[in-house]
Amino acid sequence: MSRGAHGIELTSAGKAFLEHARMALLQAEAAKEAALRAAQPARPTFALGFLSGVEIGLLPEVNRVLRDEFPGIEIRLSSDYSPALAKALMRRRLDAAFIRPEEHMGELVCRRVRTDPLIFVFPSDHRLASQVAVAPEEIVNETFYFPSKAAPAVRRAVLEYFNRAGLDLKPEYEVHNVVHAISMITSMRAVMLLPAYTRRYLPESITTRPVKGEVPTLDLVIAYHKSNNSPILKLLLSRVGKLAGAPS
């Protein structure tokens, strides 16, 4: 340290010492943070997928189940079509997913959560709205939209239902998701068969009626890779019965 015309100044040796002191403090702080992290258990994470739309009813209950046992858990959510979620499970990018059963599931294991009935959906002022239930033959002359191939399980259920009813409906018109369905039902006065849980998304201008006679249904399952030994997954699977009672 030296005293000059501009006051006290550090010498070269003093500046070097100060720099070393600053570095030592930074290293000490970093070591302290590392020690604190090491002393704390790793935060558990769980990657969970949902078929688009079903999370509204299931997620609150899933959240309660997991956080009761793992309070600090980080739940990483994904929402997509069932085929995309199944691929993510097979690639181990997801721990579990709520999906429709696919035809080729590979090394995935499924456990049924619930069975969703399909219902007829159409404009509120449609002629079918005067009925308590709708028979399949009553929509023969209507503009009918099918689910697209992006949702193969729903599409297959609808086609098989009409085949059993003896109706040869051709999938000339398709919709890709619930938002698209609402748009087509409203603008084209179309009729559709959709899972009952979609009722929660519909505006007042659209109504629903149950199917008369045999009711087509779709299973919702929780799927996971057979080699996944996660204790979080084990807990979730043990509470499937509780999830079955969640609002659909």
Segments predicted by a language model, with ranges:
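A short LG(V/I)-centered, amphipathic sequence patch enriched
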Residues: 1-12
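Secondary-structure junction motif
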Residues: 143-165, 230-237, 247
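Flexible hinge/capping segments at coil-to-helix
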Residues: 108-118, 122-144, 231-234
